[in-house]
């Protein structure tokens, strides 16, 4: 009324406008969060609601432009966001409630942290006055996840909210990418405050370096030119930096052969003549022998973890080592390097391309070719259908599909035998080795890449850790093809038990109870679970394949399901093994080729 009357007499007091404008600029923390997500370009959010985030969910309901994915478990949720981020190059965004909702993120956060995946995870928290009082669904999630996140913080004041969110996205995607956790007390999010969201941030003490020290790089290139047996080692950092094309160009200019880590698969096409194979625990004979024999190892974007080095003190014993990595902490942590270069992989490789020339590797390549011929990467011929039959079909029937694996024998076999021609085409939990990653990972990849075929490859053990995500795939109309290698065992552990534990198969037979009659005298079901019936109960398509002649037809049938997922269960001989294999405590040259 005051404003109306003042307007009539054209005498509106200034203080009234100032007070009203100030009020109009005040919004709740919940509204600011949604605004921030849009300004950061977020188009997909993976969330599971609860008491401490219900107001955020309500704000998300009111907006348009952000797709909300509702998984069936928070662990699966973060795996879906993880694979979405890996395959799109965007930041994956999660929202879960306090207490168990937050703690269910832990495995997924550790997975993303090991593999350098940019995530921003928002967790609900009880109101500030309840923190520390053992309130219902209260946990110190920032403290719990401190060692497995790149950064974590509880927002204690409403005025810090916008800046904190901006910092979270900046930290997650810059330097070595990684997961960031922001804990949001419910009362902070309800409080009114500024509607402004920062355009940029300047974080004291966090200045990620991407530029290349040219003195170090030129020193490295001189060593490369002088080497008689040079070798490139490409890790996941090459893929994260989207440097596969320029890396391939450098490889071709120098004619230096390449080995990759499992996470580096796709840094160069596996069909390229200068690609040797994966190195490490289940690397190819030629790749491991090349590392053991080279006189210069030029590593880009690797962590030199135990899966690729074998016995540390005998890794690449004849080589000088050059290491390019964006993470200072990764250099000389496990393996002493002669020339360290802290830089973004793509920037460093782009600079290399300006200077490199042919390194004269003809004799060295001939030696490597002899190793390839001596022990080609293959599997023993068996009368029953085996993994190689399935991989042959995938290579023939799918062009540039995204492959997402679980963890185990099938994972290593996939990395050995599936053709990978581009970066971010093979997705897996490489650092932490998380069972249950495969199906939700495939769902996240399919959401981010709706026009690309996505195939998950899992064992019958790992797939059951997040099998409930079939519901998510069905309701989101995702044509994910979920391949299950069913050998009725936890295969990788069984392989170790067979080779090193006297065939004492303890806790690995997934049908252990079926070895004896039930106490009620009835027979056990033939399949536990019956994956075909399970798929159908969710509304997915289920197919069981028992011989190699049925494989191609099964994949063609799956391709027809463009609006729902398909499970293809392959009945696999439990005696199938993954070779080569490095002996425990052995060097890369100590390979078991078969048993």
Model-derived features: positions:
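Active-site diphosphate/adenylate-binding microenvironment
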Residues: 30-34, 38-43, 56-60, 369-445
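Short acidic loop-to-helix transition motifs that present clustered carboxylates
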Residues: 53, 74-79, 410-412, 547-551
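N-terminal alpha/beta PP-like core and its mobile active-site loop of ThDP/TPP-dependent enzymes
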Residues: 15-356, 393-396, 479-482, 500-507, ...
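Thiamine diphosphate
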Residues: 130, 136-137, 332-334, 340-342, ...
């Amino acid at each position: 009324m005051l404003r109306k009357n003042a307007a009539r007499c054209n005498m509106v007091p200034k203080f009234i406008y100032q007070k009203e404008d100030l009020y109009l600029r005040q919004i709740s923390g919940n509204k600011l969060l949604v605004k921030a997500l849009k300004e950061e370009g977020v188009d997909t959010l993976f969330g599971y609601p609860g008491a401490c985030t219900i107001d955020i969910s309500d704000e998300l309901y009111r907006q348009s432009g952000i797709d909300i994915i509702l998984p069936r478990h928070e662990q699966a949720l973060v795996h879906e966001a993880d694979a979405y981020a890996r395959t799109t190059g965007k930041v994956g965004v999660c929202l879960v409630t306090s207490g168990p909702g937050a703690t269910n993120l832990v495995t997924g956060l550790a997975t993303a942290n090991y593999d350098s995946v940019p995530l921003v995870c928002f967790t609900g928290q009880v109101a500030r006055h309840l923190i520390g009082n053992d309130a219902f669904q209260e946990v110190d999630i920032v403290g719990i996840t401190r060692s497995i996140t790149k950064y974590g913080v509880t927002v204690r004041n409403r005025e810090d909210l916008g800046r904190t969110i901006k910092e979270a996205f900046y930290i997650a995607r810059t330097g070595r990418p990684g997961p960031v956790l922001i804990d949001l007390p419910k009362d902070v999010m309800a409080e009114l405050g500024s509607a402004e969201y920062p355009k940029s941030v300047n974080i004291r003490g966090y200045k990620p370096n991407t530029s290349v020290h040219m003195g170090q790089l030129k020193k490295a290139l001189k060593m490369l030119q002088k080497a008689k047996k040079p070798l490139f080692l490409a890790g996941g950092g090459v893929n994260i930096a989207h440097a596969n094309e320029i890396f391939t160009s450098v490889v071709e200019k120098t004619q230096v052969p390449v080995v990759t880590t499992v996470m580096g698969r796709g840094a160069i096409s596996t069909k390229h003549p200068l690609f040797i194979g994966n190195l490490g625990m289940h690397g190819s004979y030629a790749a491991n022998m090349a590392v053991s024999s080279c006189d210069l190892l030029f590593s880009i974007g690797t962590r030199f973890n135990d899966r690729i080095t074998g016995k540390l003190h005998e890794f690449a014993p004849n080589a000088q080592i050059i290491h390019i990595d964006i993470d200072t902490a990764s250099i000389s942590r496990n393996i002493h390097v002669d020339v360290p270069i802290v830089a973004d992989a793509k920037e460093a490789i782009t600079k290399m391309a300006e200077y490199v020339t042919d390194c004269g590797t003809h004799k060295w390549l001939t030696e490597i070719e002899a190793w390839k011929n001596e022990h080609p990467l293959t599997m023993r011929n068996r009368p029953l259908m085996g993994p190689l039959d399935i991989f042959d079909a995938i290579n023939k029937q799918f062009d540039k599909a995204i492959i997402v694996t679980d963890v185990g024998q099938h994972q290593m076999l996939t990395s050995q035998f599936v053709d990978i021609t581009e970066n971010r085409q093979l997705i897996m939990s490489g650092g932490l080795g998380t069972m249950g990653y495969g199906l939700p990972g495939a769902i996240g990849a399919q959401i981010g890449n709706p026009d690309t075929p996505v195939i998950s490859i899992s064992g019958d053990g790992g797939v059951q850790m997040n099998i409930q995500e079939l519901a998510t795939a069905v309701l989101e109309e995702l044509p994910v093809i979920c391949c299950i290698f069913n050998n009725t065992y936890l295969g990788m552990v069984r392989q170790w038990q067979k080779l090193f534990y006297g065939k004492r198969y303890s806790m690995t037979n997934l049908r252990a109870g079926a070895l004896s009659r039930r106490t009620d005298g009835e027979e056990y079901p033939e399949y536990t679970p019956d994956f075909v019936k399970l798929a159908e109960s969710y509304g997915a398509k289920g197919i069981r394949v028992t011989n190699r002649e049925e494989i191609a037809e099964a994949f063609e049938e799956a391709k027809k399901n463009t609006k729902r997922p398909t499970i293809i269960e392959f009945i696999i001989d439990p005696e199938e093994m993954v070779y080569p294999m490095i002996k425990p405590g052995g060097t890369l040259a100590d390979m078991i080729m078969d048993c």
